[in-house]
């Protein structure tokens, strides 16, 4: 997924969504 394009805050929320 794109984890470098998203900011730090978004990255955290994104990782949470990816984990689920």
UniProtKB/Swiss-Prot annotation:
Disulphide linkage map? none
Give residue spans, biased composition: Basic and acidic residues.
9-20
* Keyword annotations of the record: Chloroplast, Photosynthesis, Photosystem I, Plastid, Thylakoid
**Quick one: where's region Disordered?**
1-20
**Keyword Thylakoid set for record:** yes
One GO cellular component term, please give it. Answer: chloroplast thylakoid lumen
Function of the protein? Probably participates in efficiency of electron transfer from plastocyanin to P700 (or cytochrome c553 in algae and cyanobacteria). This plastocyanin-docking protein contributes to the specific association of plastocyanin to PSI.
Q: What is this protein called?
A: Photosystem I reaction center subunit III
Which gene holds the coding sequence for this protein?
Answer: PSAF
């Amino acid at each position: 997924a794109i984890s470098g394009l998203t900011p730090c805050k978004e990255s955290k929320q994104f990782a949470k969504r990816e984990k689920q």
